[in-house]
């Protein structure tokens, strides 16, 4: 069963189940770290390798010779240079790093792609997605669940149209990725905020008041006294979430809550890589400048000799 249909079943099931009294729901989407390794170029470039390639792909480069590593890096450069002008800018490098860090997202989409691309044309239309996800309901509607399914289908169609940037109701793989994982794409952030507000706003006024905010993350049922974290969340709402202190969170206040503008690790790493590699200091990188600093970007057996010895000993 694919992720979206499983989610539909879970949504219907959850509606019938009482939550644990002290269970806390976290709706905040944080910008993840680029690597679990320490960023200390004086010791090694492991952090940079993980950031540029993703942790799993970085391991494969550690097993290549320097010549093989440079050759593969050269091929990667052409993918980073989106406008094909022969230069890699900080912006292009930031976009690449963010994409590398989202590999798990793209892998998830890849696993589902064939199931939705029914006519095998390399695209997924709204009709294809709707038929796969809601086909059973459309063929034989269940009156008891019809409202839930209809509501979710309308919501999915709205999100699909938002992800579909050219408006043809046919999604490329990138657009379909934005549809399934909207929190990962800047242009989809408004729909993430809207859906969150719809989930929490019980009185339908388009805003989130204190009780709705608390009610989304905490179920009072059977609890005589509120846990300490609930009291803290009440204080957070009054002092920080509700910025204009009108007793409710609007769209912008909700966005600041669930999509905080934390430190952008990808931008910082991009600036670092350009600074270290930009030989003529024109604030952009040529293919040659990047390949010359291959040990900073991707590594090889030579730059990861200690780990290579460990792997050899294991065999």
UniProtKB/Swiss-Prot annotation:
<feature type="binding site">
    <location>
        <position position="244"/>
    </location>
    <ligand>
        <name>Ca(2+) 5</name>
    </ligand>
</feature>
<feature type="short sequence motif" description="Prevents secretion from ER">
    <location>
        <begin position="312"/>
        <end position="315"/>
    </location>
</feature>
<feature type="binding site">
    <location>
        <position position="246"/>
    </location>
    <ligand>
        <name>Ca(2+) 5</name>
    </ligand>
</feature>
<feature type="domain" description="EF-hand 2">
    <location>
        <begin position="104"/>
        <end position="139"/>
    </location>
</feature>
<feature type="binding site">
    <location>
        <position position="87"/>
    </location>
    <ligand>
        <name>Ca(2+) 1</name>
    </ligand>
</feature>
<feature type="binding site">
    <location>
        <position position="117"/>
    </location>
    <ligand>
        <name>Ca(2+) 2</name>
    </ligand>
</feature>
<keyword id="KW-0479">Metal-binding</keyword>
<keyword id="KW-0677">Repeat</keyword>
<keyword id="KW-0964">Secreted</keyword>
<feature type="binding site">
    <location>
        <position position="85"/>
    </location>
    <ligand>
        <name>Ca(2+) 1</name>
    </ligand>
</feature>
<feature type="binding site">
    <location>
        <position position="128"/>
    </location>
    <ligand>
        <name>Ca(2+) 2</name>
    </ligand>
</feature>
<feature type="binding site">
    <location>
        <position position="205"/>
    </location>
    <ligand>
        <name>Ca(2+) 4</name>
    </ligand>
</feature>
<feature type="binding site">
    <location>
        <position position="278"/>
    </location>
    <ligand>
        <name>Ca(2+) 6</name>
    </ligand>
</feature>
<feature type="binding site">
    <location>
        <position position="284"/>
    </location>
    <ligand>
        <name>Ca(2+) 6</name>
    </ligand>
</feature>
<dbReference type="InterPro" id="IPR002048">
    <property type="entry name" value="EF_hand_dom"/>
</dbReference>
<comment type="function">
    <text>Involved in regulation of vitamin K-dependent carboxylation of multiple N-terminal glutamate residues. Seems to inhibit gamma-carboxylase ggcx. Binds 7 calcium ions with a low affinity.</text>
</comment>
<feature type="binding site">
    <location>
        <position position="282"/>
    </location>
    <ligand>
        <name>Ca(2+) 6</name>
    </ligand>
</feature>
<feature type="binding site">
    <location>
        <position position="119"/>
    </location>
    <ligand>
        <name>Ca(2+) 2</name>
    </ligand>
</feature>
<feature type="signal peptide">
    <location>
        <begin position="1"/>
        <end position="19"/>
    </location>
</feature>
<feature type="domain" description="EF-hand 1">
    <location>
        <begin position="68"/>
        <end position="103"/>
    </location>
</feature>
<feature type="binding site">
    <location>
        <position position="92"/>
    </location>
    <ligand>
        <name>Ca(2+) 1</name>
    </ligand>
</feature>
<feature type="binding site">
    <location>
        <position position="212"/>
    </location>
    <ligand>
        <name>Ca(2+) 4</name>
    </ligand>
</feature>
<protein>
    <recommendedName>
        <fullName>Calumenin</fullName>
    </recommendedName>
</protein>
<keyword id="KW-0325">Glycoprotein</keyword>
<feature type="binding site">
    <location>
        <position position="164"/>
    </location>
    <ligand>
        <name>Ca(2+) 3</name>
    </ligand>
</feature>
<dbReference type="GO" id="GO:0005576">
    <property type="term" value="C:extracellular region"/>
</dbReference>
<dbReference type="InterPro" id="IPR011992">
    <property type="entry name" value="EF-hand-dom_pair"/>
</dbReference>
<dbReference type="GO" id="GO:0042470">
    <property type="term" value="C:melanosome"/>
</dbReference>
<comment type="subunit">
    <text>Interacts with ggcx.</text>
</comment>
<feature type="binding site">
    <location>
        <position position="121"/>
    </location>
    <ligand>
        <name>Ca(2+) 2</name>
    </ligand>
</feature>
<feature type="domain" description="EF-hand 4">
    <location>
        <begin position="188"/>
        <end position="223"/>
    </location>
</feature>
<dbReference type="GO" id="GO:0005789">
    <property type="term" value="C:endoplasmic reticulum membrane"/>
</dbReference>
<feature type="binding site">
    <location>
        <position position="203"/>
    </location>
    <ligand>
        <name>Ca(2+) 4</name>
    </ligand>
</feature>
<dbReference type="Pfam" id="PF13202">
    <property type="entry name" value="EF-hand_5"/>
</dbReference>
<comment type="similarity">
    <text>Belongs to the CREC family.</text>
</comment>
<feature type="binding site">
    <location>
        <position position="289"/>
    </location>
    <ligand>
        <name>Ca(2+) 6</name>
    </ligand>
</feature>
<feature type="binding site">
    <location>
        <position position="242"/>
    </location>
    <ligand>
        <name>Ca(2+) 5</name>
    </ligand>
</feature>
<feature type="binding site">
    <location>
        <position position="280"/>
    </location>
    <ligand>
        <name>Ca(2+) 6</name>
    </ligand>
</feature>
<dbReference type="Pfam" id="PF13499">
    <property type="entry name" value="EF-hand_7"/>
</dbReference>
<feature type="binding site">
    <location>
        <position position="166"/>
    </location>
    <ligand>
        <name>Ca(2+) 3</name>
    </ligand>
</feature>
<feature type="binding site">
    <location>
        <position position="175"/>
    </location>
    <ligand>
        <name>Ca(2+) 3</name>
    </ligand>
</feature>
<keyword id="KW-0472">Membrane</keyword>
